[in-house]
Amino acid sequence: VRQPADFCGVIGLKPSYGRISRYGLIAYASSFDQIGIFSKTIEDAALVLEVMAGEDEFDSTVSSKPVPPYSKLIERKEIEKTTSPKKVAYFKETLFHPGLDPEIKTKIESYLNDLTAKGYIVEAIDFSLLSYLVPTYYVLTTAEASSNLSRFDGIKFGHRTKQSIADLNDLYKKTRTEGFGEEVQRRILLGSFVLSAGYFDAYFTKAQQVRQKLVDLTSTVFSKYDLILSPTVPTTAFGLGERNHSATEMFLADIYTVYANLVGIPAISIPLFTHSNGMPFGLQVMSASFN
């Protein structure tokens, strides 16, 4: 949600994991999936979240925490009554990543300086795990996807081929080849590979360990700071079909957004900036779970 929101100049909100029921959603990666919100205004995002959030007897992963009156909390008088300048962190490595557009870097740095001038405490902190985020995310999500999407076999779920079939395996093969797009097939194959006996410990187990390190790090950061800020995406929107030849390039566009998914915290992309190429781009704001 945050990446397309950034590209299109709108607000994109990913709530905390478990804030909104996933009942009715096709499961992709169950420990990551969270329904998000696109909106033109913060008020709309708050109102929609207030309506959608909360317990659901059909989803065991949804949180039972009470749903705050988000739409009331963001009214100006409430903000003025309860808000003081925050302690804000940003990961140094996010602004020095070689893939980050120099103009995006400059505008984010300028914004951080503006916050400091307004009385916010803004501090850079080290984040040595940045380069691990995308590999960890894709190892774990594709592993979960290969399991979740195995139910679409043409018998109990989903599309069923109309071609003549020789046996059950032939039914599976033709059905899944027709029913899944190229990118979905790529992710299923990658997930099946990392879960295979010879590679489970080398990839899946190590990715789980990195995820736990990230959770621990996040807990430490939010014990000292209220917010983490970063660019949402390293570049503005690229041309249609421009990166189709390189799955790796496409995956790396997620370098700033997957962190919140890995650790389950809420994150929002706010469209604050316009690039000299005329395209919008946003600031990503993250806070502790359910904050």
Where are these regions (language model features)?
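Short glycine/serine-rich loop/turn segments
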Residues: 1-32, 91-93, 143, 230-248
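Conserved active-site and cofactor/substrate-binding residues in soluble primary-metabolism enzymes
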Residues: 5-8, 40-47, 65, 102-110, ...
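Short, solvent-exposed loop/turn segments at the edges of secondary structure
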Residues: 6-8, 15, 30-33, 83, ...
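Short acidic, glycine/serine/threonine-rich loops at helix termini
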Residues: 2-7, 24-25, 100-103, 134-138, ...
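Glycine-rich, small-residue loops and helix-cap segments
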Residues: 114, 118, 122, 132, ...
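A short helix-breaking turn/cap at a secondary-structure junction
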Residues: 11-106, 111, 169-174
